[in-house]
Amino acid sequence: MPDPKIVIGVTDCSKYANYSSWILAHGHNVEVVQLSAARNNLSDIKVCNGIVLTGGEDVHPRFYNRLDLYEYCYKDDVSEARDEFELRILEHTEANAVPVLGICRGLQIANAFFGGTLIPDIPRWGKFNHSKLPDDTDRYHTVQVDPDSWLHRITAQKEGRINSNHHQSADVIGNGLVASALSPDGIVEA
C-alpha cells in the first residue's frame, strides 16, 4: 500500500508558485493546497499536515494592538482580510498541533498571533534597510544564530547568510516563541 500523501497548505501571495514548486520539488508524495481569503477555503486546512505562511503585505497594527503605528505601514500594502484569514489558520494549527513554517510576513503574523508586536517600518526604527536594493535585486546579509535555538540544533551553524526583503519585523516576541536568528542590527530573521 502506498504511503499517504503529505498535504501542505500554503497561503496565497504573489510568489505562491515559487513556494509551491519548492515544496513539490522535495517529495514525490506531497500535495500542496493553496489557502487564501479570496478563495474562502479555510476548511481545506483540515486535510493539511503542515502549513507555510508566506510573505506579502504588511500586517495591520490592530492585530498586535498598536493602532498608533498604522501611519508607518504601506497603506496600499495592507490586507486585513488576509490577516484575519491567517490568524484563523493559526487558531486551527495551535488547537490541532499542526506544524507551521512562517516566512517573512508569515513569521510576523505568527508573532502577532502569540501576543507579540512588530516594528512597522524598520528604517524608521534606526535599523538598516532590509528591503530590496534600488535596482530591485534582493539584499543579503548575515544572521547570528542563537546557539540554544532549535535552528542551531538543526543546522549546527552559528552564522548564516540570508536574503532580506521586508520593512516590518518582530519586535516584542510572542508567548512561547524564540528569536532564533538576528541580523547584525538586531532584527529578528528567524
Residue ranges and their predicted role:
Residues 107-109:
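Hydrophobic, aromatic-enriched interface-forming segments
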Residues 1-101, 111-119, 123-161, 167, ...:
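N-terminal beta1-alpha1 cap of cysteine-dependent amidohydrolase-like domains
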Residues 104:
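Conserved G/P- and acidic residue-centered "switch" motifs that form tight phosphate/ATP-binding loops
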